Swiss-Prot record:
Cellular component terms (Gene Ontology): cytosol
EC numbers on record: 2.7.2.11
Catalytic reactions of this protein: L-glutamate + ATP = L-glutamyl 5-phosphate + ADP
A Pfam match: AA_kinase
Species for this entry: Ligilactobacillus salivarius (strain UCC118)
Protein known as: Glutamate 5-kinase
Gene (name only): proB
Predominant location category: cytoplasm
GO molecular function: ATP binding; glutamate 5-kinase activity
Position of the signal peptide: none
Pathways involved: Amino-acid biosynthesis; L-proline biosynthesis; L-glutamate 5-semialdehyde from L-glutamate: step 1/2
Localization per record: Cytoplasm
């Protein structure tokens, strides 16, 4: 069993999913966002370098427009993302300001991190912001992202985006907050006897088999996308934790070594 004390992690990427930001009734969960901002501000005050990868643009757009179901058409999704992203950043800036924490926005597309020159520029931007103790709030630039045969600009989901960012900035730790307590041996929403897997050192068929399923009606990511992201972290020798984001201050407990969620690391 790996030592769970993660206090040595200096550079941390936190990914929060739509389900942690939007209530089941479609309303924005301001209480959770406030707790998240309080927690991440506290980490910066402890001399941690923190990057927040935040989903939720489409979900906030849905709430803003009074809609309850994510549309299937790409133009509608991108229009909602345009509405929701600006509102989401306004909420983040207001909440972080309550704790005297400065923030910034970085909207990425896949090709930005594919081409060496643009990749170097954006990673330099991350490093400068972290040096200034500013928290970058990262999302995919959903309004322009496409996924075509000859031109891919979409990451597909923010679980993978968070892993790409963690890799690019050489983070020590990735924390993915979701609507589930961690990785289970089978879907806990369907099976009452499902057991939490507390530690994973290799992504094999057994793990990928346990990770079947899709995301919430407001988001895109399911467990399979999270496992893909965790596989990258393990292969790069980085640590990652998958935990429930219902109470974002759980991050403090994770760093202090409490047995929460699933820890992914190289053996």
């Amino acid at each position: 069993m790996e030592n769970r004390n993660l206090q040595d992690a200096k550079r941390i990427v936190v990914k929060v999913g739509t389900s942690s930001l939007i209530r089941a009734n479609g309303k924005i969960n301001l209480q959770a966002i406030d707790e998240l901002c309080y927690t991440l501000s506290g980490l910066v005050n402890e001399d941690k370098e923190v990057v927040l990868v935040s989903s939720g643009a489409v979900g906030v757009g849905l709430a803003n427009m009074g809609l309850v179901q994510r549309p299937k058409q790409i133009p509608e999704q991108q229009a909602l993302a345009a509405i929701g992203q600006s509102q989401l950043m306004t909420i983040y800036q207001q909440r972080f300001a309550m704790y005297s924490q400065k923030t910034s926005q970085i909207l990425l597309t896949h090709d930005v991190l594919t081409y060496p020159e643009s990749r170097e520029n954006v990673l330099n931007t991350f490093n400068e912001l972290l040096k200034w103790k500013v928290i970058p709030v990262v999302n995919e630039n959903d309004t322009v992202a496409v996924d075509e045969m000859d031109h891919q600009t979409s990451f597909g989901d923010n679980d993978w985006l968070s892993a790409v960012v963690a890799s690019g900035i050489d983070a020590d730790l990735l924390i993915v907050l979701s609507d589930i307590d961690g990785l289970f041996n089978k879907n806990p929403k369907k099976y009452a006897d499902a057991n939490l897997i507390s530690e994973v050192t290799e992504i094999n068929e057994k793990i990928t088999g346990a990770a079947g399923g899709t995301g919430s009606r407001f988001g895109t990511g399911g467990m399979a996308t999270k496992i893909k992201a965790m596989d990258r972290m393990i292969n790069e020798g980085r640590k990652a934790v998958l935990a429930n984001g219902k109470r974002p201050s759980i991050i403090f407990e994770i760093l202090n070594g409490k047995q929460i969620g699933t820890l992914f690391h190289k053996k």
